[in-house]
Curated annotation (Swiss-Prot):
Catalytic activity: (E)-4-coumaroyl-CoA + 3 malonyl-CoA + 3 H(+) = 2',4,4',6'-tetrahydroxychalcone + 3 CO2 + 4 CoA
Primary enzyme class: transferase
Coiled coil regions, renumbered to chain: none
EC number: 2.3.1.74
Species lineage: Bacteria, Bacillati, Bacillota, Bacilli, Bacillales
Organism: Bacillus subtilis (strain 168)
Name recorded for this polypeptide: Putative chalcone synthase
């Protein structure tokens, strides 16, 4: 259906290690839980070393109106999307020369952590020299599954228009959804996991001119599968309050992954007459350490097949939908690739839902 040719990323300026984040959580939650020390162990045991935020950590101690937070979301998302797209279209590791903006036929913009109408990609088109005829497809509300879903929908677009070049932008500022007055355990655990991140991926159809690509081997998306678990709205998502986005985050997510995901993956692989042993790498959205452990246990994978997911979790935490693009970029730059080997891209999100993509390594140019 489509090739992934490049990924560009942009990270906010404020880097926070887990020790500092745990101190912040103690300050915010110490009077709400008698077992605060036990709960704070999740910061140390979660295999996250650092995360990045759009504001200094002290800023989050005070309450801010939804209006203020959403205005910051628009400004910061636009700034970082611009940087990620520029890198994506001109990354010297991926291209011999930059891809012209006018060559991009469609832009898929994915987010779940703020609101903007016109949507961010429209604002971006006023700042970068895209053609005014570029198709815009904003995708909102898929949470952590959004990046994989954006790639899948973009690949399907390329199947219909095989000469097209298409951008997928995923921008999540999870930190701006933090509500200091929310003293629930879900909010505390979320404080140990989520960070901010923005990324852009360039895809092209099978008949597109890829001669400028430097990739010896590129992931060619062959198929995608979306699955919804019915009656599971309470697993993850948002409640909307006067203060903005209030996190819904079930403690049962790792168990659901372990019990539910394997069947979905098996059905997807059976469709292509493949087995788990045929999959050389799983480029997964790393929801957290327990989710990665559930992937390994449920799918019978070695930790090596999830090394990029583990690496990104350590460096950046859970950046919601943007995370999967960071994982793919890490593997493009550092991972093992062999022609014709198969791999999976996967993510889970609100619904409760899963998005899976099957790819093979094919000649990039």
């Amino acid at each position: 259906m489509a090739f992934i040719l490049s990924i560009g990323t942009s990270l906010p300026a404020y880097n926070v290690n887990q020790e500092k984040a745990a101190e912040f959580a103690r300050y915010m939650f110490q009077h709400s839980f008698k077992d605060i020390d036990r709960l704070l162990s999740s910061f140390k045991n979660g295999q996250i070393h650092s995360r990045q935020f759009v504001k200094p950590i002290e800023w989050y101690k005070e309450g801010h109106s939804f209006e203020e937070k959403n205005q910051i979301y628009i400004e910061e998302t636009l700034k970082h999307s611009r940087a990620a797209v520029r890198e994506c279209l001109s990354h010297p590791e991926f291209f011999q020369e930059a891809i012209p903006y006018e060559k991009v036929e469609a832009v898929f913009f994915v987010s779940s952590t703020g609101l903007s109408t016109p949507s961010i990609e429209a604002r971006l088109m006023n700042e970068l020299p895209f053609s005014p005829y570029t198709k815009r497809i904003p995708i909102w509300g898929l949470g952590c599954a959004g990046g994989a879903s954006g790639l899948a929908r973009a690949a399907e677009y390329c199947k219909a228009y095989p000469e097209a070049f298409v951008l997928v932008i995923s921008a999540e500022l999870c930190s701006l959804t933090f509500q200091p007055e929310d003293k629930t355990k879900s909010n505390l655990i979320g404080t140990s996991l989520f960070g901010d991140g923005i990324a852009a991926a360039l895809l092209c159809g099978e008949k597109a001119d890829r001669r400028v690509s430097k990739l010896k081997l590129a992931p060619k998306i062959m198929d995608a599968q979306s699955v919804l678990m019915k009656q599971s709205e309470d697993v993850m998502g948002w409640d909307f309050t006067d203060q903005g986005f209030k996190v819904i985050f079930s403690r049962d997510i790792p168990t659901l992954v372990e019990k539910w995901l394997k069947t979905n993956v098996q059905i997807f692989l059976d469709k292509h007459k493949l087995s788990f042993h045929d999959i050389s790498v799983f480029l997964a959205h790393p929801g957290g350490k327990k989710v990665i452990d559930a992937y390994i246990k449920s799918l019978g994978l070695s930790s090596e097949k999830l090394s990029s997911a583990q690496s990104i979790l350590q460096k950046h935490g859970n950046m919601s939908s943007a995370t999967i693009l960071y994982v793919i970029k890490d593997h493009l730059q550092n991972g093992h690739k062999k022609e014709a080997e198969r791999g999976l891209i996967g993510a889970l999100g609100p619904g409760f839902s899963s998005e899976l993509l099957l790819f093979s390594w094919e000649k990039g140019a």
